[in-house]
Amino acid sequence: MRPHVDRRQAQVLALVRARGSVRVAELARELGVSPVTLRRDIEAMAARGEIRRMHGVITRVERGRDAAGRDAPPGAGAGAADGRVPGGALRDGGGLLVGMVVPTTDYYYGDVVRGARAAVEARGARLRVGLTRYLPDEDRTQADRLLSTGAHGLLLTPNWEAGSPGPGEGDWTAGLPVATVLVERWAPPGHPAAELDRVACDHAHGAARAVQHLAGLGHRRIALASRTTPTTERLRAGYGAAVAALGLEPAPAWPPTGHGPLSDADLFARTLDYLCDAVTAGGVTAALIHSDTDAIMLIPRLQARGVRVPEDLAVITYDDEVAGMADVPLSAVAPAKREVGARAADLLLDRLSGGSALDGPRQHLELLPRLTIRQ
C-alpha cells in the first residue's frame, strides 16, 4: 500500500506548492479520499516539514537559506509541524507574506496601509497589497490572487457599501483558507463574517464626541451632513445617540434621495441646500460634516449664500486630512487610521505565529478617534 500513499502525498505536495494554500475539506473532495485518510497524510507531511497546517488549511513551506547561503531543506526554520511560526522567527525575518485587500491607497486607506506595512515589516514579514477600486466582486478576486501568490494570511476590506454585508453578501470571507482580519468593516451577529477577527475605528464614538463638544459650547440643534460611505451608518448611529442622550433638539431631517444614485455634483448641491435651509429655517447653529474635504468646499458656498462660519454655523469635520488648512481652521474628528492598520497586522501575525493566540477567542477591536479643537 505504501506506493499509493507516497503518490497521494506527492500529489498533495504538488497542489500545495502550486496554489500556496489549500483547504483540507476541498482537497479531500478533489483527491477523492476520505478526510480521515487525508488528515493522516497531512500529519505525516507536516511532521517532515513539507507543509504547514493551520485553521483547516495546509500551506506550502517557503524555502529558506542556511548560514552559508545554500537552500535549506523544506522544513528548516518552518516552525512546528502544525504550521505555527514562532514569534522569534517573525522578528528575525521569518518570511511570512501578508496579503492586504483594500479599495484604494488614496485618502483614508493610505494611512491604514502605511500602518499595516510598518507593523508587518517590524516583525520581519512582508506585505502585498491588492486594490479593488470598489469594483463588484473584485475583493474576492484580489483575495484569491494574493492566496495564489502564497499569502499566509489576509487583511481584508471588502466592498460592502454600508461597511457591513447586505443580505447574502460576504459569506465567502468566512470560508477563506487562511487566517483573516477584517479592516474597517463590520459584520452583524449571525453573519458568518462575524466570526472573523476585525479592527476598525469606532466612528459612532467619534460622531458622538463631536456632538458633545458642540453641545458644551451651547449649541442645541446640531446637524449631521454626510454623503453615503461605509462610515455613514455608524456616524448616524453615534450622532443620534448623542443627540438623544444630551436632550438636544432634533435637526431637520436629511432629505430623501429619491430614485437612483446621484452624481457627486448633485450630492454636493443637496448638502449645500440642506445646510442653508437648516440654518435659515430650521434653527441649526452647528454641524458635523463628513468629510473635511467636503466641508472646505462647502464653507465658501455657504458664506456666499449668507451663512457665516462660524458665526451662524459652527462646523466640526469628520476626518482630519485637510481641515487644518482651511481659511477658517476647522476642528476635526480624526479616525486612528494608521493605528487600525498596525493593530490589524499585529493581530493577524499573532494568529500566524502560533502559541495561545492561534486558537484563542476572536477579537473585535474598535479604536477611538481623536477630536482636535482649532480656534
Task: Name each model-derived stretch.
Residues 3-7, 18-21, 42-127:
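HTH-adjacent hinge/linker in prokaryotic transcriptional regulators
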Residues 11, 108-122, 206-209, 230-250, ...:
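Short, solvent-exposed amphipathic alpha-helices that sit
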Residues 99, 151-159, 223-226, 280-291, ...:
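Periplasmic-binding protein-like
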Residues 121-131, 240-268:
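Short beta-strand elements in bilobed, periplasmic/extracellular small-molecule ligand-binding domains
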Residues 157-208, 293, 319-330:
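Flexible loop/hinge segments that line or gate small-molecule binding clefts
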Residues 187-189, 196-224, 234, 265-275, ...:
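Hydrophobic alpha-helical segments within soluble ligand-binding/sensing domains
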Residues 208-248, 361-375:
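An alpha-beta-alpha
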Residues 277-375:
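Flexible loop/turn connectors
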